[in-house]
């Protein structure tokens, strides 16, 4: 009888657990809504319909899981959600066609279960906006026709120029001597490329951004194109050239105004912008995230058109761990805020500040209660006091979306020297995150490895920087060009391995680890920029396998 009672209790307890799990989760099987893999059909309209249903049916305390079956899903612009997004460090071209637009979500998980999401045209694959406690996991993002054209050097003749062969997936045409890459609703011409060694996949030594003169080309036979004016003796037969533009309309994943986001086991194989761009978000964890090739046998040599991951004006803690970042055309990670340039001193408590860079404007900069400080642009001297925003409004627009200028009122009197004609910027200290960048591999990419510009603690540990063609780690800060804040006060760089970084020269790349704020008038600087006011910058227990390049520049 005693055993029977125990058995009944066990069964009841198990049932209660199942019931509790059922009540705490609402699972949406995408296949129940017509979203099935490997059919070659346009998933965009069906996905948009499902997301609207999930958004409408959200309930407090219930986790909503959108679950896909493994396989390939094709997304086209037709039937996709259209959104106006102003995205930091991207081209502000709108509207954008969004494959999966997750907005105003709470406790929602998108679980791909190994799904391969393939996009067509010029799309923003996934957005997560104004959401909390959400996640994306177990899926990959790619495009059917990348806007980058990969070609192979077949012959390099000093007199006849270069004979090259486009990769099999490049849908090209030659019109009036111009080589044109074609996709769904777009065409692309090129004048620059990134050369890769065809055997090692490393960016070739001392090539950087190579000019590729592919004007007046002729197609000698299908798949073989002669560029008589493209002459560069560094490019041997067998070299792979990644032809790229400077456009970056959208990242693969766009995050804005989110809180507590987890992205796990997501791979981005290509995007015309960055892999992931997060702005004005709090607490982000990337685990096993990759901007990477599809494996060692992938015939592509490239991934994203710009950075792998980028965090602009975030707060809380950013964790990026166990990731793979390779083949991207810019940095693996960049963490910063944005300076506004002071355009006008309205009164002793009020200024007008402006977003200055053409790829960073149109989004929120600050809120009432935020702490700010002023900086002199040409010396990067930070004024000693901090101020609290009592009021902030867009100045040149009715709403924050699309605004370049803000009128900002502060609690204390602003120093008399802060004037437009004196060249000052203002930094928001409240939107600056702590960072952990750990156990990641960064390899075979253009430009730099990891960039940090935040006064909060930064730990960079147990990473492998393998042939980053520029600086591996950069502590920057710039109130003159990119306008990316701010000073680093507490940085630990430990137990990392660096192999042959700095094989080419790019902006701010003076050593393997480069502490390089942009200071136009260094002689006029009165104080330091990075370090101090905290732990400072500690570099310990790292391994450097290098050639005749400096390890540290400051």
Model-based region annotation:
Residues 15-16, 32, 65, 192:
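Compositionally biased regions
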Residues 20-44:
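Mature N-terminal, pre-catalytic/accessory segment of carbohydrate-active enzymes
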Residues 1-25:
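Bacterial Sec-dependent N-terminal signal peptides
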Residues 38, 44-554:
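Extracellular parallel beta-helix/beta-solenoid repeat domains
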């Amino acid at each position: 009888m005693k055993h029977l009672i125990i058995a009944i209790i066990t069964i009841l307890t198990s049932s209660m657990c199942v019931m509790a799990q059922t009540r705490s989760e609402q699972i949406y099987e995408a296949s129940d809504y017509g979203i099935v893999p490997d059919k070659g059909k346009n998933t965009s309209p069906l996905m948009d319909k499902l997301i609207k249903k999930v958004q409408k049916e959200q309930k407090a305390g219930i986790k909503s899981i959108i679950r896909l079956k493994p396989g390939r899903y094709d997304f086209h612009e037709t039937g996709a959600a259209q959104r106006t997004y102003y995205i930091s460090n991207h081209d502000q071209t709108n509207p954008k066609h969004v494959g999966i637009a997750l907005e105003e979500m709470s406790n929602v998980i998108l679980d791909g279960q190994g799904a391969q999401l393939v996009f067509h045209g010029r799309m923003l694959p996934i957005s997560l906006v104004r959401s909390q406690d959400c996640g994306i996991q177990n899926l990959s993002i790619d495009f059917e026709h990348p806007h980058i054209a990969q070609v192979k050097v077949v012959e390099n003749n000093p007199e006849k120029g270069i004979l090259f062969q486009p990769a099999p997936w490049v849908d090209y045409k030659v019109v009036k001597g111009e080589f044109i890459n074609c996709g769904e609703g777009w065409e692309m011409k090129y004048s620059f490329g990134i050369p890769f060694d065809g055997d090692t996949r490393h960016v070739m030594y001392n090539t950087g951004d190579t000019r590729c003169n592919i004007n007046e080309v002729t197609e000698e036979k299908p798949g073989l194109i002669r560029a008589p004016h493209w002459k560069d003796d560094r490019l041997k037969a067998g070299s792979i050239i990644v032809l790229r533009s400077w456009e970056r309309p959208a990242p693969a994943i766009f995050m804005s105004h989110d809180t507590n986001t987890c992205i796990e086991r997501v791979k981005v194989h290509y995007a015309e912008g960055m892999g992931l761009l997060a702005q004005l978000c709090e607490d982000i964890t990337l685990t096993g995230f990759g901007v990477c090739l599809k494996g060692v046998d992938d015939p592509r040599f490239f991934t994203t058109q710009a950075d792998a991951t980028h965090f602009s004006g975030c707060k809380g803690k950013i964790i990026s761990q166990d990731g793979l970042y390779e083949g991207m055309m810019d940095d693996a990670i960049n963490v910063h805020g944005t300076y506004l340039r002071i355009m006008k001193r309205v009164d002793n408590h009020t200024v007008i500040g402006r977003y200055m860079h053409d790829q960073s404007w149109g989004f929120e900069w600050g809120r009432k209660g935020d702490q700010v400080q002023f900086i002199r642009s040409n010396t990067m001297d930070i004024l000693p006091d901090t101020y609290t925003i009592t009021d902030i409004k867009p100045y040149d627009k009715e709403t924050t979306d699309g605004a370049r200028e803000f009128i900002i009122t502060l609690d204390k009197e602003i120093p008399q020297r802060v004037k437009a004609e004196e060249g000052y910027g203002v930094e928001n200290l409240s939107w600056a995150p702590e960072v952990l960048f750990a156990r990641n591999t960064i390899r075979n990419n253009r430009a730099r490895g990891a960039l940090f510009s935040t006064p909060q603690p930064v730990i960079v540990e147990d990473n492998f920087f393998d042939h980053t063609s520029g600086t591996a780690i950069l502590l920057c800060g710039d109130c003159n060009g990119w306008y990316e804040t701010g000073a680093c006060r507490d940085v630990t760089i430990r137990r990392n391995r660096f192999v042959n970084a700095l094989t080419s020269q790019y902006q701010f790349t003076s050593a393997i680890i480069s502490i390089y704020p942009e200071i136009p008038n260094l002689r006029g600087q009165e104080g330091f920029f990075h370090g101090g006011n905290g732990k400072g910058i500690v570099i310990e227990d790292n391994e450097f396998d290098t050639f005749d390049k400096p390890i540290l520049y400051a």
